Amino acid sequence: MKFLLSNDDGYFAPGLAMLAQTLQRYGEVVVVAPERDRSGASNSLTLDRPLTVRKAANGFHYVNGTPTDCVHLAVTGFLDFRPNMIFTGINHGPNMGDDTLYSGTVAAATEGFMLGIPSVAVSLAGHSGKHFASAGKVVEQLVERCLEEPFQQPVLLNVNVPDAPPEEVGALQVTRLGRRHAAQPVIKSQNPRGETIYWVGPVGAVQDAGAGTDFGCVASKQVSVTPLMLDLTAYGQLDRISTWLHR
């Protein structure tokens, strides 16, 4: 198999190194990742300047752009082959519920899916960063399952792995996205010149972590696998909005 890898933590991130190390056992691996941390970049593309691709000492390619730039550039012009699968991550921190809308890791996988390639975003759902090997084991399971029964059409999967030793990580479970409460207010401060500055505040507390959610799954030390889709249409509101417009 031929794999394209990317992330949003930057080409130097330990999670990306673990992902590459894991997938090299199964085929050809090419890494095209941002030159710096682009967490929270979501699906943004760089349109106001050209992009450059450079090669690091470890063989990874890095781009002066967003995670979505990396995958788009790689698939549509940089690579001389079409990847069989795209993996993004292993993200240092969870990407669950509403987080998926902001995540560059999920966005990079989404770009691959939009280009017709099965794509998987993988995150280590904790901030200690101690157990990337556990996420690597999960990637192995997913690839081996794909080898046994390949996807017949492109899929987009969001995978969150508990930040725990491999022996403590439970089975893979198919989940839906949970929800958070609204984010906390921005943090207002001053720089040394006395100018007012703002930092984006912490994420909101978990609101929906019930049965079947990604939050609930990871809290029980199981692996959350959430199939994602791109259609944002609120079908349940079509009739109501139509009535409102034409009343």
UniProtKB/Swiss-Prot annotation:
Record localization: Cytoplasm
PANTHER family: 5'-NUCLEOTIDASE SURE, 5'_3'-NUCLEOTIDASE SURE
Source superkingdom: Bacteria
Annotated SUPFAM superfamilies: SurE-like (SSF64167)
Cofactor annotation remark: Binds 1 divalent metal cation per subunit.
Role description: Nucleotidase that shows phosphatase activity on nucleoside 5'-monophosphates.
InterPro entries (alphabetical): SurE (IPR030048), SurE-like_Pase/nucleotidase (IPR002828), SurE-like_sf (IPR036523)
Residues annotated to bind a divalent metal cation: 8-9, 39, 91
GO cellular component, one term: cytoplasm
Stated family: Belongs to the SurE nucleotidase family.
Swiss-Prot/TrEMBL cofactor(s): a divalent metal cation
UniProt keyword list: Cytoplasm, Hydrolase, Metal-binding, Nucleotide-binding
Molecular functions (GO terms): 3'-nucleotidase activity; 5'-nucleotidase activity; exopolyphosphatase activity; metal ion binding; nucleotide binding
Membrane-crossing residue ranges in chain numbering: none
Chief localization: cytoplasm
Protein encoded by which gene: surE
Record EC number: 3.1.3.5
Catalysed conversion reaction: a ribonucleoside 5'-phosphate + H2O = a ribonucleoside + phosphate
Protein's recorded name: 5'-nucleotidase SurE
